[in-house]
Amino acid sequence: MSKPIQMEKGVKYRDADKMALIPVKNMPTEQKEVLRKPDWMKIKLPADSQRIQDIKAAMRKNKLHSVCEEASCPNLAECFNHGTATFMILGAICTRRCPFCDVAHGRPLPPEAEEPQKLARTIADMKLKYVVITSVDRDDLRDGGAQHFADCNREIRELNPDIKIETLVPDFRGRMDVALDLMKDNPPDVFNHNLETAPRLYRKARPGANYKWSLELLKKFKEQHPDVPTKSGLMMGLGETKEEIIEVLKDLRAHGVTMLTLGQYLAPSRHHLPVERYVPPSEFDELKEVALELGFTHAACGPFVRSSYHADMQAQGLEIK
C-alpha cells in the first residue's frame, strides 16, 4: 500500500501529484487515445503581446492572482490583450482537487489581510469598468472565504464607484447560511456559481461537491437579493448527454438563474479527465435556443465560452461565442 502524500503548507500540487490525492479513483490508469482537436478549436494568438505582459506585471507587482493563468484558460491571450482579467482571491491553492481543473491543490496559506485594498488599487490603475472576482475553494476557513469576498467588494467600490462587480463563488460547503449572511451587505452586481456538469458526473468530475447544494446556494442568494441576477456555467465534453444538459438548464431556471454559460471542456494535461468529445458549434447554437426558450435572459454558448469570458458583454446580453 503506497504511503499518502504529506502536503506541505503553501506548496502547489499539480497534475499527477494532484490527481494522486483524489480519494475516488475514477480515471483509467492508462490514458486512452487523446482526441484530436477539430478546426473550430484552433486559437489565433494576438500579434502584439505587450498588453498581456503589462497585465501580468501588474499582477506580480501587487502579488495578485488571475484564474486565467492559474487555471490555464485558453482565452488568456485574447482577454489579456483586451485589458481584461478575472482576479482570483484567497490565494492560488485550492482545498479541492477536481480532476478537470488546473488550479493547484494543497494546504493554503492564511488569507492576506491587505488583498482587498491591493485588488481595489490594481483595478483602479487598470481603469476597469467591469470586473470578475473568483476564488479557490477554502474549506479550511470557517466562513469559506465569504468575509474576504465582502471585503473585496467593499474596497473595490470605494475606489471605483462606477464599477460593476461579478463574483464567481465556490459552494461554501457546510457553511452556506453563514457565507450568505456575511456577504449580504456587500453583494455583487452579478452572482455566479458554476454547476460545471450534469449530476451523474459529479462523483467523477467534482469530488466533494453536491449538485443540489449548489442549486440551493443560487436559490438562497436570489431570495435575499431579488434584484441581482444569478448566473451559472457548464462544461461540455465530459461524457454528458444533450438531454442531461437540458435537464440541468431546467433545474437552473427553477432556482431563479437567468444567466448561462456553456463551453467546451479542454483537458489541461494528460493527468486530467480526458475530453470525451468535441461539441460542434451548431450544438451550442441549439442549446442556446433551448436556454432562451426556457427563460434565460442571457445565454453565452460556444466552444471557447468560459464563465468570465467577455463577462461585461455577457451582462449586456451581447452575442458571445
From Swiss-Prot:
Binding site for [4Fe-4S] cluster 1: C68, C73, C79, S308
Any one Pfam family match given in the protein's UniProt record, by short name: Radical_SAM
Cofactor list: [4Fe-4S] cluster
Cell compartments where the protein resides: Cytoplasm
Keyword hit for Disulfide bond: no
Pathway info: Protein modification; protein lipoylation via endogenous pathway; protein N(6)-(lipoyl)lysine from octanoyl-[acyl-carrier-protein]: step 2/2
EC number per UniProt: 2.8.1.8
Presence of the UniProt keyword Phosphoprotein in the record: no
Domain Radical SAM core: 80-297
GO cellular component term, pick one: cytoplasm
Keywords, ordered alphabetically: 4Fe-4S, Cytoplasm, Iron, Iron-sulfur, Metal-binding, S-adenosyl-L-methionine, Transferase
InterPro entries xrefs: Aldolase_TIM (IPR013785), Elp3/MiaA/NifB-like_rSAM (IPR006638), LIAS_N (IPR031691), Lipoyl_synth (IPR003698), rSAM (IPR007197)
Reactions accelerated catalytically: [[Fe-S] cluster scaffold protein carrying a second [4Fe-4S](2+) cluster] + N(6)-octanoyl-L-lysyl-[protein] + 2 oxidized [2Fe-2S]-[ferredoxin] + 2 S-adenosyl-L-methionine + 4 H(+) = [[Fe-S] cluster scaffold protein] + N(6)-[(R)-dihydrolipoyl]-L-lysyl-[protein] + 4 Fe(3+) + 2 hydrogen sulfide + 2 5'-deoxyadenosine + 2 L-methionine + 2 reduced [2Fe-2S]-[ferredoxin]
Comment on bound cofactor: Binds 2 [4Fe-4S] clusters per subunit. One cluster is coordinated with 3 cysteines and an exchangeable S-adenosyl-L-methionine.
Major localization class: cytoplasm
Binding site for [4Fe-4S] cluster 2: C94, C98, C101
Gene Ontology molecular function: any one: lipoate synthase activity
Sequence similarity: Belongs to the radical SAM superfamily. Lipoyl synthase family.
PANTHER family, per the entry: LIPOYL SYNTHASE, LIPOYL SYNTHASE, MITOCHONDRIAL
Name of the protein in its database record: Lipoyl synthase
Organism: Vibrio parahaemolyticus serotype O3:K6 (strain RIMD 2210633)
Lineage: Bacteria, Pseudomonadati, Pseudomonadota, Gammaproteobacteria, Vibrionales
Gene: lipA
